[in-house]
Amino acid sequence: MYKRQLLNSAKKNLPRSFEIETIKVPGVFEIPITISKYLKKFDAFIALGCVIKGKTPHFDFISQSSTNAIMDLAINSKKPIGNGILTCLNINQAKVRKKKGAEAAKAIVSVLSQK
């Protein structure tokens, strides 16, 4: 829903020297497996997406499993993965948080600059 704003806010906060490739996936649940396919190709990742709570527990399962999988990938690969996946209770929360991609970008830049 707010993919473009998330992506634009992330890109604006990355150094110009970074080579950026955007990879689209069907949904948030597919982000971790897609990152795992590209671990050898890239030094860092930014996961962007939005999950809005509905009337079933699906929101909880997707939010928790994708967050856990992304953290596991980052720890096991020792590569930073900025988590810019919005988990919102309603559309208004998503509107307010649509620039959170910037925080995910700043996080990976910070980790990459550590020695």
Label for each model-derived stretch:
Residues 33-69:
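Glycine-rich phosphate-binding loop
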Residues 1-2:
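Short, small-residue-biased leader/transition segments that mark boundaries at the very start
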Residues 60-87:
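Short, acidic/small-residue loops that bind anionic groups at enzyme active sites
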Residues 11-25, 83:
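Short beta-strand elements in bilobed, periplasmic/extracellular small-molecule ligand-binding domains
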Residues 88-101:
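Phosphate-binding/catalytic loops
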Residues 98-115:
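A charged, well-structured terminal subsegment
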Residues 20-37:
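N-terminal beta-loop-helix "entrance" segment that forms/cooperates
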